[in-house]
Amino acid sequence: IFENVEDLITGADVVVSCVTVAHGQFASDTCFKSGVLVVPVHTRGFQNCDLFFDQIFADDVAHVEGFKYFNQFKQFDEFARILLKQNPGRTSDQERILAYNIGIALHDIYFASQVYDKVKDSLPDISSDKLSEKFWV
């Protein structure tokens, strides 16, 4: 448990944020180490990253072209172009990548799969019984 957001982000390999409101930046530029992947689902709190991250991806141009720093992105592309193999995505372990997830499930499924594949061998074995009955939450 972290009391300070900068402490949480500093040194992280992956940062996923799902906040709907942010009143400023979550962390200073120096908190984002080389090689970090930042996935802000609702795009709040990471605008400073727009100016120094190596690659920025989003669902589509229309979702982000109105962002304050859009014209200053170092390198931008639509996320689907990675899946279509028209863009290689990460080309080095040092690249800082920002992937704005505006609202299509493509991001969610892809990133969950990639993160899981990276850590699955270090996870403890957990057995779970499949639910066979419908339920309401």
What are these model-predicted stretches?
Residues 2-71:
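Rossmann-like adenosine-cofactor binding region
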Residues 45, 49-137:
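Adenosine-phosphate binding glycine-rich loop
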Residues 1, 30-31, 99, 116:
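Broad hydrophobic/π-residue packing in well-ordered secondary structure
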